[in-house]
């Protein structure tokens, strides 16, 4: 059997046809965590709310949280439909379902939180029955739902499952020179990542992607990877032909 993978996908469905084909055809078990940034932003704007970010996290006042949940719900259902009609039965869930994700609030950001616990029982039950779980990054604390960064949620779920975490992005891994495909790093350790950050090789928008991969390792994932979300990505990644794989040592 092919390796079980936790895959974090973006929330945008624009241009996602090839990626959906790729995921639907993967022969091994998958758990997917999805974002929803574009859909959330569009709905907030439509309803007259302003989108604000602090440290890359969406500020989510209580009055906006229902909008965020609605947008994530719609995104998850569309992704699940896209996979199901390609032959991979997928079920869209929220992290609040069956207490999958337990969170701790970051009050300065409103109803935003970080994951402090993961219950994987429902995910494993669905996998055993032949379904692919598709999880929206909503956690629960004592006061209700929390908006959680999708990369953070994906790393936590991968760690709880003990599965590798694959973060699909718009770039093909880490490069010493982004303009030269021959300079891709096929594999990095946390120590090497810190050295590359000090050199300025890993900078800008790549930093949060790499940090998400390292967080997955700390949570218990055997390895993590950053790769471009396009047709053939999983085959290339698992064969060492694409992406950047992060291992504990």
Swiss-Prot record:
GO molecular-function terms, A-Z: acetylglutamate kinase activity; ATP binding
SUPFAM superfamilies named among the record's database cross-references: Carbamate kinase-like (SSF53633)
Catalytic activity: N-acetyl-L-glutamate + ATP = N-acetyl-L-glutamyl 5-phosphate + ADP
GO annotation terms (biological process): arginine biosynthetic process via ornithine; L-arginine biosynthetic process
Protein name: Acetylglutamate kinase
Compartment annotation: Cytoplasm
Keywords: Amino-acid biosynthesis, Arginine biosynthesis, ATP-binding, Cytoplasm, Kinase, Nucleotide-binding, Transferase
Xref: HAMAP family: ArgB
Coiled-coil positions: none
GO CC terms in record: cytoplasm
InterPro entries for the chain: AceGlu_kinase-like_sf (IPR036393), AcgluKinase_fam (IPR004662), ArgB (IPR037528), Asp/Glu/Uridylate_kinase (IPR001048)
Gene name of the encoded protein: argB
Binding site for substrate: 36-37, 58, 147
UniProt key word Kinase: yes
Family named by the database record: Belongs to the acetylglutamate kinase family. ArgB subfamily.
PANTHER family: N-ACETYLGLUTAMATE SYNTHASE (PTHR23342), N-ACETYLGLUTAMATE SYNTHASE, MITOCHONDRIAL (PTHR23342:SF0)
Reported function: Catalyzes the ATP-dependent phosphorylation of N-acetyl-L-glutamate.
Site (Transition state stabilizer): 8, 209
Species of provenance: Thermus thermophilus (strain ATCC 27634 / DSM 579 / HB8)
Enzyme nomenclature, EC number: 2.7.2.8
Major subcellular site: cytoplasm
